[in-house]
Amino acid sequence: MQAPIGASRPQRVKQYIPSKPHKWGYKIRCLNSDDYLLHFEIYGFKEGAPSDAGATVDTVLRITAAYQQKQHVLYTDSWFTSPALLDALAQRGIRLCGSVRSNRKGMPAVAKEEVLALNRGEWLQRQKGDATVAVWRDQRCMWLLYNHCSPGESASLERWNDFGRKVSVGCPRAIRDYFYRARSVDVLSQLHYAYCCELTLETSVQVC
């Protein structure tokens, strides 16, 4: 997860993130489990020259260093997920499941025509080595890269239809796992912003 810590003083490592409630601040990259923050790293400090895998992969390997060779599953969003990250984590005993951008280098080939032909609740999967990419159609197509479970396993999710009712929609098991685990990131993000708001309200009170 990426989250900014609001800051007003000028600093070299401050970032501008227009999509976040706090536009200016220190960008931190977080590792969390079940709503609890395990480790974080402030973005902007140089850690030497990046490896061939790239700076993003290097960052993930640093913040997961204490959890290697324990067969944990790491869930990531499309900012971090890539075939290079999946391979690097697999070598260190960590499995990966994350949303991914369709144009990432090294992705298994998926024909555009096949993707466009999908209806809601349908999916297709392609494998390349240990990596599996799933393209699942809900209201729109979602791309997922994973190696933590078998590609043949299916499941279902409750989704809203056009009439405002919940319906059961079929999906690969990896998609269900990702949606379930992504909730902890959302909760941690909400707590983070609520805590920042409390600090702002508290420090704005003047005692006369």
Regions found by a protein language model. Give the residues of each.
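Acidic, contiguous segments within the catalytic cores of piggyBac-derived transposases
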Residues: 2-208
